[in-house]
């Protein structure tokens, strides 16, 4: 662990969503986590106390806005306000998993664009920069009028599969929206791609239709940004096997894994599901099929580069 930032104006704080990841990030940077307490009043209101001076400091807050989403967003907003009033030089919010990202447009009449609302709230509270990972909709970057560094999980996932030495692989996108992501992994692994043509009649319900591309006799690797109820990914895995794939792996950056997800994965044709620790994975969800990778080195390096005013774009590759 480097120690060059121990006595610097770089401060890293963690709220309640993912303290283990925050500790790993701080260790990579070479600092301890900042001292703060996040409590609740008897009526449930959030109470935050910053227990050290941060005047003139460049502060980075680690907080995924995962379940419970609204609790974690309020913690983040209140922390930003506290830092602003305590005269922090910059307030950089590190959101490994950006909640509400799937509400990025009006899909039906009279629907809100909640991801834009969240961006407005964060800016109004006083955030000066955002660092995030694999936004569900990349255009969310345009919802902010402050700098945003959008990191990618594909290199981490690709490197893992490269070490496995799998033969005759094909990278599969479970829907048309994920083709760009699948192509990036395919380029890194020098593999062809295939696409699942999927129809979704209502939220959290999906129906696999057709497979575009050659998967017969190949080792298929499904890649997605988020796996929520796992309906899409398990139906895709079953369709791949039915159409001749020899075995199926799956991976994602954000393992939401809500509702019946774990049961579906356990009973599916997926040989291994590779995820990152952008969201805390409870012990009951750590089944043998699930393998977790850490994004701490990636995020830690991004924080160092932002603090040192160096280019972050090198990390996108």
Swiss-Prot record:
Keyword Magnesium: yes
Family: Belongs to the ribose-phosphate pyrophosphokinase family. Class I subfamily.
Chain residues that bind Mg(2+) 1: 136
Identification of the protein by name: Ribose-phosphate pyrophosphokinase
Domain of life: Bacteria
GO cellular component: cytoplasm; ribose phosphate diphosphokinase complex
Residues binding ATP, per UniProt: 43-45, 102-103
PROSITE patterns: PRPP_SYNTHASE (PS00114)
Annotated transmembrane regions: none
Group of enzyme by EC: transferase
Binding site for D-ribose 5-phosphate: 200, 224, 228-232
Protein keywords: ATP-binding, Cytoplasm, Kinase, Magnesium, Metal-binding, Nucleotide biosynthesis, Nucleotide-binding, Transferase
Purpose of the protein: Involved in the biosynthesis of the central metabolite phospho-alpha-D-ribosyl-1-pyrophosphate (PRPP) via the transfer of pyrophosphoryl group from ATP to 1-hydroxyl of ribose-5-phosphate (Rib-5-P).
EC identifiers of the protein: 2.7.6.1
Cofactor binding mode and count: Binds 2 Mg(2+) ions per subunit.
Keyword Nucleotide-binding tagged: yes
Names of required cofactors: Mg(2+)
Designated gene of the protein: prs
Example GO molecular function: kinase activity
């Amino acid at each position: 662990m480097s120690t060059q930032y121990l006595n610097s104006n770089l401060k890293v704080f963690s709220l309640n969503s993912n303290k283990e990841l925050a500790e790993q990030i701080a260790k990579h940077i070479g600092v301890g986590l900042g001292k703060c307490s996040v409590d609740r009043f008897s009526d449930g209101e959030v109470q935050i106390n910053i227990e050290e001076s941060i005047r003139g400091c460049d502060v980075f807050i680690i907080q995924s806005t995962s379940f419970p989403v609204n609790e974690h967003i309020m913690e983040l907003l209140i922390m930003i306000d506290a830092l602003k009033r305590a005269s922090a030089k910059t307030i950089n919010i590190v959101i490994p998993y950006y909640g509400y990202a799937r509400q990025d447009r009006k899909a039906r009449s009279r629907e809100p664009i909640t991801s834009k609302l969240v961006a407005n709230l964060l800016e109004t509270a006083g955030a000066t920069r955002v660092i995030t990972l694999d936004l569900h909709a990349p255009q969310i970057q345009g919802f902010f009028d402050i700098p945003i560094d959008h990191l990618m999980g594909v290199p981490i996932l690709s490197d893992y599969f490269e070490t496995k030495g799998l033969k005759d692989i094909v990278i599969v996108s479970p829907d048309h929206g994920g083709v760009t992501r699948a192509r990036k992994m395919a380029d890194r692994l020098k593999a062809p791609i295939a696409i699942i043509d999927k129809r979704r009649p209502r939220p959290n319900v999906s129906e696999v239709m057709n497979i575009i591309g050659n998967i017969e006799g190949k080792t298929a690797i499904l890649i997605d940004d988020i796996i929520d109820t796992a309906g899409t990914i398990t139906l895709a895995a079953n369709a791949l096997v039915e159409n001749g794939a020899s075995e199926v792996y799956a991976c994602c950056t954000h393992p939401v894994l809500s509702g019946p997800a774990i049961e579906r994965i356990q009973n599916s044709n997926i040989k291994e599901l590779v995820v990152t620790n952008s969201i805390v994975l409870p012990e009951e969800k750590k089944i043998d099929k699930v393998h977790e990778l850490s994004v701490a080195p990636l995020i830690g390096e991004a924080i160092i580069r932002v603090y040192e005013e160096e280019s972050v774009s090198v990390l996108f590759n």
